[in-house]
A protein has these predicted regions:
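Auxiliary alpha/beta "docking" domains used to position bulky ligands
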Residues: 1-132, 141-206, 254
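A beta-strand-loop signature enriched in Asp, Gly, Thr, and Trp
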Residues: 234-254, 265-298
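Amphipathic alpha-helical scaffolding segments comprising HEAT/armadillo-like alpha-solenoid repeats
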Residues: 302-306, 333-344, 364
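Short coil turns that connect the paired helices of HEAT/ARM alpha-solenoid repeats
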Residues: 311-315, 344-351
Length: 364
């Protein structure tokens, strides 16, 4: 058994574990990783300081996998479709309703559900290598035959870059990974391994001359093809941004209250994206087009109960209420004015500021 045989073994394992796509990339200094330090230096990462983490050699960890794992030789990339049969954000109705990003509708935090499946692939990889110790060419004296690290959006690796070079999809002009058959509604899981496996060919870029994602972005966060300024991105503003949202960006946020799907909703490759039948990715009750009044005045107890095990808990109750109040300001519906007025007196300055802004907007 060789590196090709192992690759041929783990791909069916990924399929049986529930993944839709699986590919293998070598560990290299890809051009996109070379651009990453420049992107950070230009301030495009906003307040996401964790992206600036550096290794002992001073290099950005996410730009150089070898600086974190000197033994790394290959990366197994698995992708799973989370799309569901619900309307897109570009077509949702009702001014008193908000929008939560499709990935956050799920009944279980995707980190947990995807990692659980990824562990099955990792176990099969280890089993195959341990049964064929000659494959462990990089093993050091006294080291295990195979070293692995598995991550779902939590490790020191730019997953989508490795996904491209694993042939799973190409990087679109909206910076999302796009697969020709599945579209871009994909969760990624990666396994970094010390074993050199047969790599797949990179996926060709099929965006062509299309710029629909760039044209559709309300806050102009896509400053150039394949280039995102997170400071302007609605997903960043509603999830990662702490404190108040810059006033000049609030109107562009529309009624997005957690994340944003616009640049994916308008992508032609998602027109025929299949819907997942996996139970854990189906929408929780009330999260598709949620009532803005409910979100703005949700109690701490209700927030914890409703979003236990959900990625929405990342924004915290204060952030979600802030987002809902900005959405109320953008709704144009004066029936929501009492909510803005009540919350303008809230002791949380982030909430009261958003509510006061909403009042002003509704009076226009």
């Amino acid at each position: 058994m060789n590196g090709h045989d192992i690759a041929d073994l783990i791909k069916p394992t990924a399929k049986s574990a529930g993944f839709d796509l699986c590919g293998i990339a070598p560990v290299r200094n890809f051009p996109e990783l070379g651009r990453f330090p420049e992107w950070i230096a230009e301030g495009y990462a906003g307040e996401m300081k964790y992206l600036e983490s550096r290794g002992e050699n001073g290099k950005l960890r996410r730009a150089s996998l070898h600086s974190v794992f000197p033994w790394a030789r290959s990366v197994v990339v698995c992708a799973i479709n989370y799309n569901t049969a619900h309307p897109h954000s570009t077509g949702f109705n009702g001014p008193t309703r908000g929008w939560i990003s499709r990935y956050a509708w799920s009944r279980e935090d995707y980190h947990d559900s995807v990692l659980r499946r990824l562990r099955q692939v990792e176990a099969k990889l280890k089993e195959a290598v341990c049964a064929n110790p000659l494959l462990a060419t990089s093993a050091r004296s006294g080291a295990p035959l195979i070293e692995t690290r598995s991550y779902v959006d939590t490790g020191p690796i730019v997953e989508r870059v490795y996904a491209k070079y694993a042939g799973v999809g190409w990087l679109g002009k909206n910076t999302c990974l796009i697969n020709q058959k599945v579209g871009s509604w994909l969760f990624l899981g990666v396994i970094v391994t010390s074993v050199e496996l047969a790599a797949d060919l990179p996926a060709p870029d099929r965006c062509g001359t299309c710029t629909r994602c760039i044209d559709a972005c309300p806050t102009k966060a896509l400053v150039a093809p394949y280039e995102l300024d997170a400071n302007k991105c609605i997903s960043y503003l509603t999830i990662e941004k702490r404190g108040g949202v810059p006033e000049e960006l609030r109107e562009g946020m529309g009624r997005q209250v957690f994340g944003c799907d616009i640049c994916q909703d308008v992508c032609p490759w998602n027109r025929k994206a299949p819907a997942s039948d996996k139970p854990e990715f189906q929408a929780r009750e009330g999260l598709v087009n949620p009532a803005l009044a409910w979100l703005a005045e949700m109690s701490e107890e209700e927030f914890r109960e409703k979003f236990r095990g959900s990625p929405i808990k990342r924004t915290k109750r204060s952030g979600l209420r802030r987002n809902a109040l900005i959405a109320i300001g953008n709704s144009g519906d004066r029936s929501l004015m009492p909510i803005a007025e009540r919350n303008s007196l809230d002791p949380d300055p982030v909430v009261s500021d958003a509510a006061s802004w909403a009042k002003q907007q509704l009076l226009k």
